[in-house]
Amino acid sequence: MPKTMHFLFRFIVFFYLWGLFTAQRQKKEESTEEVKIEVLHRPENCSKTSKKGDLLNAHYDGYLAKDGSKFYCSRTQNEGHPKWFVLGVGQVIKGLDIAMTDMCPGEKRKVVIPPSFAYGKEGYAEGKIPPDATLIFEIELYAVTKGPRSIETFKQIDMDNDRQLSKAEINLYLQREFEKDEKPRDKSYQDAVLEDIFKKNDHDGDGFISPKEYNVYQHDEL
């Protein structure tokens, strides 16, 4: 093999092995990182705890661990109403999905989330969250209900038992859920939520949501 080719071959092998080593080291570092959870308050009576697929209602504030500066406050959005989201399906960062598992309604937590469970090397929000940032969240959970895609919830919404959900049925369900946090929404807000639900789920455009369209998690038999 000519010297030039031999050198090039060794050069390529070196960088391949270096890349493999770097990737393995990064994977090892990420595997040692974990979400740290501090329970600030937990109600004495806790008969129901949060799990993947549940619908949660919570407020949370986010801070940069580096300097303690606040980058997010849920109370400044949606007229101060707590946020509704489904746990464990990617509606929040992975670290929050982990941190809010096994929580009771009324519980408060302070959690530390490493970059690999937050925004990683990319950062977020045009520099508001820099690359490789460790985040701190203070969380207060208000309600844990059956996820919107569970069998039980589908049957609860389907008032006439025709195995499809109409706009009237879902509108009534939303109204009941919004009333649970004792902060009734304006009708225009509820209408916007209803429109968004059908836009994202009524795939055939027939004005109803079928069991197949409803069950996006594909793990329940309807």
Swiss-Prot record:
Positions of the EF-hand domain: 145-180, 189-222
| Residues holding Ca(2+) 2 | D202, D204, D206, E213
Query: Per the record, what are the reactions this protein catalyses?
Result: [protein]-peptidylproline (omega=180) = [protein]-peptidylproline (omega=0)
* Region annotation Disordered: where it falls in the sequence: 200-222
- Attached carbohydrates are found at N45
Q: Is Calcium a UniProt keyword of this protein?
A: yes
Q: What class of enzyme is it?
A: isomerase
The chain's coiled-coil residues are none
Checking Pfam families in the record gives: EF-hand_5 (PF13202), FKBP_C (PF00254)
- The domain of life is Eukaryota
Q: What does this protein do?
A: PPIases accelerate the folding of proteins during protein synthesis.
Q: What is this protein called?
A: Peptidyl-prolyl cis-trans isomerase FKBP7
Question: What's the source species' lineage?
Answer: Eukaryota, Metazoa, Chordata, Craniata, Vertebrata
